């Protein structure tokens, strides 16, 4: 739920982004240049579409963004967004994602969050499991040398998961964008150079 006094909420409304999360991706991309013109991008857990909007703007009309979520996401202006409604862990949904892209992904984005219970240890464990599912998806559909960006909730399970990521990527960094709420336990893991 958005806090109406939140400056990023207000900025998103003013600038036409579907969520304040758009600024997290904008900031990460400005610093790390993970998105480029013509790229093929998957946005896992894309609802409501803020990250897909940003990715679509950067990759341009020669690129493609394939968004997947269990919640219906409205079309995004620009014509380079394809939405697939469903659970990305299911084989038939994965097949739709792959055939929609037509080639391996250059970048896989995931700002996905589990349904939060308010029990920090449980929510963090569910976050790690979701991230493991995204990593497994990336193992199959991300091109060699590609980039994976994941949101995760900090906790005791993260260290072990970082080791898993380092087995699959040349470089793994933890990021906390300034647009992320200070009180939030979320961080982003940027994984570059898929092995």
Language-model region placement:
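Class I SAM-dependent methyltransferase Rossmann-like catalytic core
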Residues: 1-37
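Conserved class I S-adenosyl-L-methionine
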Residues: 37-47
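Class I S-adenosyl-L-methionine
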Residues: 152-195
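Mobile active-site "lid"/loop adjacent to the S-adenosyl-L-methionine
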Residues: 85-88, 103-145, 156
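Conserved SAM-binding loop of SAM-dependent methyltransferases across substrates and taxa
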Residues: 48-60
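Glycine-centered, small-residue-biased loops immediately flanking beta-strands
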Residues: 39, 63, 146
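S-adenosyl-L-methionine
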Residues: 68-115
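Glycine-rich helix-loop-beta junction characteristic of Rossmann-like nucleotide cofactor-binding loops
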Residues: 30-36, 101-102, 140-141
């Amino acid at each position: 739920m958005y806090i109406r006094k939140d400056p990023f909420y207000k900025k998103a409304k003013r600038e036409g982004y579907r969520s304040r999360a758009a600024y997290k991706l904008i900031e990460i991309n400005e610093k790390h240049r993970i998105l480029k013109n013509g790229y093929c991008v998957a946005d896992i857990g894309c609802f409501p579409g803020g990250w897909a909007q940003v990715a679509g703007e950067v990759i341009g009309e020669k690129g493609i963004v394939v968004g997947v979520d269990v919640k219906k996401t409205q079309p995004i202006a620009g014509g380079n967004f394809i939405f697939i409604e469903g659970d990305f862990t299911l084989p038939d949904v994965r097949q739709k994602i792959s055939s929609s892209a037509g080639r391996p992904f250059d970048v896989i984005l995931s700002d996905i969050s589990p349904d939060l219970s308010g029990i920090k240890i449980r929510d963090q464990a569910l976050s790690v499991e979701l991230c493991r599912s995204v990593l497994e998806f990336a193992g199959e559909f991300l091109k060699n040398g590609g980039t994976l960006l994941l949101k995760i909730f900090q906790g005791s399970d993260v260290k072990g998961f970082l080791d898993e990521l380092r087995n699959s990527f040349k470089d793994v960094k933890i990021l906390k964008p300034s647009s992320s709420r200070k009180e939030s336990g979320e961080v982003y893991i940027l994984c570059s150079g898929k092995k």
